[in-house]
């Protein structure tokens, strides 16, 4: 039986339509070259179906990625959720509309214990840009983390609204934690009601909501870190680096 990693490689080779990456960027309002290149490099285009490839259908079925004869994440952007050692726990798929995300159920995966992108964050935190050494940025959404990752920022996603004690303990691997919850009621609870059980010296950064007007009938709303990156790109370093250097516990608001 093939490993999940081997089957994922087959998915990338046979099912991911890289010609759709530009459409993914358009739907997510990504305009900067860094994130566009990142999407291509990581095969973040929309998935097709293996309907004429019996061998591929069989291996997909072996790992639980086949549903009624078709790839479970057909029509979605396929993103692997990995363990801290880099091995694949399961796959999650994104598309515009409802439901936006669909995670393939797997005995090796639980939102209660897994951080999204932890493997890359550990590598970037201790082997990447020295400005971020020993630090990590905690966000809610998968694409928040991926967008930061594209700019070399060690970032992990909760994949939900809470950070329980187990996941909070994992954060002790880092010297400095910067929490960036979404700007909504759930995100506000992360600080006000302490829904995120994070180290005591963690910094909370809130992105102030603002709508930008670009000429007649064209506007862009910034309400989370993904939106901020879509508009301002590499300027994110000007925001995060000073917070990394401050080892105390603070609350900051990113006023645009």
Locate predicted features:
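Short charge-dense sequence patches
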Residues: 2-9, 141-144, 197
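TOPRIM fold recognition
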Residues: 25, 89, 100, 132-136, ...
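Short, exposed beta-strand "edge-strand" segments with a Pro/Gly-rich flavor and a Y/T-containing core
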Residues: 23-30, 103-126, 212-231
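Aromatic side chains
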Residues: 8-11, 30, 101-102, 174, ...
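TOPRIM metal-binding catalytic domain and adjacent DNA-binding surface shared by DnaG-type primases
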Residues: 1-78, 82-85, 127-131, 243-256
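Phosphate-handling DNA/RNA-contact segment within nucleic-acid enzymes
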Residues: 50-175, 190-191
């Amino acid at each position: 039986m093939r490993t999940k990693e081997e089957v994922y490689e087959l998915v990338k080779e046979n099912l991911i339509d890289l010609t759709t990456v530009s459409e993914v960027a358009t739907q997510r309002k990504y305009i900067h070259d860094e994130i566009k290149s990142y999407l291509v490099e990581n095969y973040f285009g929309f998935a097709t179906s293996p309907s004429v490839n019996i061998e591929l259908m069989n291996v997909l079925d072996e790992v639980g990625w086949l549903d009624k004869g078709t790839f479970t994440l057909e029509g979605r952007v396929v993103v692997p959720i990995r363990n801290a050692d880099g091995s694949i726990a399961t796959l999650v798929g994104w598309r515009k509309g409802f439901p936006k995300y669909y995670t393939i159920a797997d005995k090796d995966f639980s939102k209660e214990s897994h951080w999204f992108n932890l493997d890359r964050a550990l590598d970037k935190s201790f082997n990447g840009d020295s400005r971020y050494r020993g630090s990590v940025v905690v966000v809610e959404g998968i694409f928040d983390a991926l967008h930061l990752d594209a700019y070399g920022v060690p970032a992990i996603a909760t994949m939900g609204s809470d950070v329980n004690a187990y996941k909070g303990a994992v954060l002790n691997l880092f010297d400095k934690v910067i929490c960036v919850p979404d700007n909504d009621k759930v995100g506000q609870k992360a600080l006000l009601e302490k829904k995120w059980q994070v180290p005591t010296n963690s910094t909370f950064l809130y992105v102030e909501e603002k709508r930008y007007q670009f000429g007649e009938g064209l506007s862009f709303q910034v309400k989370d870190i993904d939106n901020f990156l879509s508009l301002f790109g590499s300027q994110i370093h000007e925001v995060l680096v000073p917070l990394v250097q401050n080892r105390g516990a603070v609350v900051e608001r990113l006023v645009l």
